[in-house]
Amino acid sequence: MRSLAPGIKLITSFSRDSWYRFSILILTFVFYTSYHLSRKPISIVKSQLHRNCSNVIHPADLNITDNDTWCDWAPFDQNNYQNLFGVLDNCFLVAYAFGMFFSGMFGERLPLRYYLSSGMLLSGLFTALFGLGFYWRIHSLWYYCLVQALNGLVQTTGWPAVVACVGNWFGKGKRGFIMGIWNSHTSVGNILGSLIAGVYVSSAWGLSFIVPGIIIACTGVICFFFLVEKPEDVNCTPPQHHESVEQEPLLRNSSSNEEIFSSHTSTAVEPVEDHTEAISFCGALKIPGVVEFSLCLLFAKLVSYTFLYWLPLYISNIAHFDPKEAGDLSTLFDVGGIVGGILAGLISDYSGGRATTCWAMLIIAAPMLFLFNKIGQNGLPTTVGMLLWCGALVNGPYALITTAVSADLGTHECLRGNSRALSTVTAIIDGTGSIGAAVGPLLAGLISPTGWNNVFYMLITADVLACLLLSRLVYKEIRGWCGYTTRQRG
């Protein structure tokens, strides 16, 4: 009897449910990678929009009236260019934060496939419109601000929808590890966005936006044709979101050994109730832990997004790299973020303490940020090492809160399997965090003219505040480890 080929054996060793779950992970990973890929170019292009023109060789046939700004792109050729960059960032981030609070409620009530597809197509349009300003020779600040604001609104379609989709397919077992790996799409998108933008930034910076815009629009088409929102839509088995016991400590993990690609279904899976109404905004706020983690993410995301938008310019100004080199070097921060997100998920799965894991990483991040500012420019090896460490410690808690914590709270035991709370809870947490994401780059734009030291002091303060906001949850988790019974709210 002839044996099956090894590849076929591998394929048949997994169940139909497992292959669908795997495909959902891959698809949603690609979708949100494209979202972040389309956000990153602005941070790379900043150092091209305003340069030190005295070091640039100008064409012989060009009539130059101002030797200091002839190579800059108006209106960013002014002395207050850093403030203008801050305004530009804020147009996107304020619109994103505002829209996020409503996006979750739309996501609960609209088909996720249509919602995501339309969001990605519109994001591609507005990203490309920013780059077309180069070819259309647009020098109006209002044009770029309007495009950024509209892009910020449509980009809110992404996060609540992909988290809700993954939450529909995966139960609580090993959720931190699965989502820690899956959440690397944020850093992968930032890295790809930096590299793609870096290819065109010195020659035709408009393509730094147009190419990512085309990519995210194409992923929107893929989403429309291939996304499956729920296991029930294709007759797959829904996941188990809760333990069978009556009481569940706040954000403690199941001790069951649920496998990612299990080919057998447990008989202990509780039946999924068919809720006809999505959870209300106020109802989501009453879920234990939502307020604390939302406020913590506000400050954690403030730090992360300040790096996202200002790190290439900081490296270019302080370490004196050209725009492409600064953009390439800044990707190391995101490489560290990938490792940090996976480690945060693993540690929180093993310990059962989501809040404690976030708290520990944030408290270590504060002195590391201080060191980065002091010694981060002392040679390339030091810069690389500090970027990796700071990326892991800053983005680790941010990744854990926006993925595993959001999914845990969105399928909390008090909801009894109502996964229609997932999108709203995720939107509340990420929307609150996005307020910090809007404030951070704006403050950096206002503070940076007084010196980069002051920017880092602001970031360290935000890190410490994020730690303090988790203190109550950390205390409850530690008491649980010591054998005390935690009393649930709600």
Walk through the language-model features, giving the residues of each.
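Cytoplasmic membrane-interface "Motif A"-like loop-to-helix N-cap segments
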Residues: 108-120, 349-363
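Helix-loop-helix hairpin linking two adjacent transmembrane segments in secondary transporters
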Residues: 186-234
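Cytoplasmic helix-loop-helix junction between adjacent transmembrane helices
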Residues: 145-188
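Glycine-rich segments within core transmembrane alpha-helices of 12-TM secondary carriers
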Residues: 176-202, 216, 333-337, 427-440
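Cytosolic juxtamembrane N-terminal segment immediately preceding the first transmembrane helix
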Residues: 1-37, 42-43, 51, 55-76, ...
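Extracytoplasmic gate region of multi-pass secondary transporters
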Residues: 42-44, 287-342, 398-403, 439-440
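C-terminal ends and interior cores of transmembrane alpha-helices
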Residues: 121-138, 363-377
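Hydrophobic core of transmembrane alpha-helices in multi-pass small-molecule transporters
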Residues: 126, 140-157, 298, 380-410
